[in-house]
Amino acid sequence: MNISSNPMAHAIAILFIVFSFLFIPATTLFESEQEGYISAVISNKGLDFAKDLLIEKAVSSMIPLQLSDIEKSVKIPVIGKVQLGLSDIIICSVDIASSSVETGESGIVLVASGATANLSMDWGYSYKTWVITISDKGTAIVQVQGMVVVLNVALINQEGTLKLLLLDCGCHVEDIYIKVDGGASWLYQGIIDAFQGKIVSAVEDAIVKKIREGIIKLDSLLQSLPKQMQVNGVVALNVTFMDDPVLSNSSVELEINGLFTGADGVSVSNYCYYYHKGSQTFLSSKGSAKMVEISLHENVFDSAASVYFKANYMHWIVDKIPDQSLMNTAGWRFIIPRLYEQYPDDDMNLSMAVTSPPIIRITDHDIGTTIYADLVIEVLSSGEVVPVACISLVISASCSAEIHGNNLAGSIRLVNFTSSLKWSNIGNLHMHLVQAVMSTILRTFFVPYLNLHLGKGFPLPLPHGFTLQNAEIILQDSRVTVCSDVRFTDRYDLNNQLPVSW
């Protein structure tokens, strides 16, 4: 494959960026400040995808690769001492026959084998006779075969960010073939004798040097990753890495904090989150294996609800609903007669406020939520807003999760609710009649309004340029797990930034 040029460091980043957003739970009871609530696992299929992408990008980043000039004096039979030189030595293309990636206690080991590299170069020579100096020049084509490149790295957690350590890096060339254009009959063997080993060493050293430079650059970029991902003007996601990555012989596993905080940096640390983290296996193994599984514990959603609640985003003034007659006291004349008697034909508002953060619980087949809210009936009388009664609601709803692009979205369905009179300035209310009106309001305003926003969802922590493909959602063990393949769209600038969404 002949691949155009791109910066080496960012190309090598592709593999480890994929690794950097894969998370798995541990096995003990912890608080949120110590453990992560977004976890994921990357499978062998995902590792192979990342490996192939890494190799493609690494090759494209280093081609064309110019090597240093080589000079040497050699003795040629009959002719004597000859000064030989090679210049403009360029690796033009690299083809990888096979590759593998292994993970385990020794780190991540990537092996590219059976590689072939094609080089072009200029040659020149000169030697002196007793009368004159004789010189010549031309071009040559070189092919190195049986090249093996081995890269061994480790990922560790350093104060909430990932640090990349290069454990070993090597390149070995098995064979070399040289084709010389032009020159005297003795030139070919002279170049072979003088430069075969030097060309091999130059290729091996240049590739290793490029990889080392890329690893150093990548480590610096990983260290610079922010620990917070802005979702919108209200909430941000804590993406601090928790614990060291776990590398088994079939997967790479990491975890992040995963709780939402206020966009201004205010956390919800006064809410204590506890859960038991059991060992995690691939949920998609029953069917076709997916590349990655991203798991979000129910506490992630609880933290988001807490932030929105604290930011006063769970208070609505309702003045328009499909049954607009309920926005006038005349529509209530048979439901609350005294309301109409005191405020005949006055327009109304309904002020609805959630009184505590919604409680979200995930079971094996459902996402359930309980919402406590107060609904205040307000009358617009003589230019004033007059609260006349308050009804307390306990709402039970069922949520479904779905994937829209790279966003985890959803919808909500009203299961049931109870209502009770909290206070009233218009006497006692017939709550069985009011209950029917509350049902209409909840089904025609509250639920559609929530679904409008839930349908947009929030972004999963994926690298820029990667999209989910054929995603499935599984509900299990208090978690929403997204099992998905990924696709690389290459729609970002590798030259300017590390390709991550935060």
Regions found by a protein language model. Give the residues of each.
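N-terminal secretory signal peptides that target proteins for export/translocation
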Residues: 1-7
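Mobile, glycine-rich extracellular loop/lid and propeptide segments
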Residues: 134-135
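Extended, low-charge, aliphatic-rich alpha-helical segments
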Residues: 9-16, 20-120, 165, 172-502
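Short beta-strand micro-motifs enriched in acidic
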Residues: 152-158, 400-404
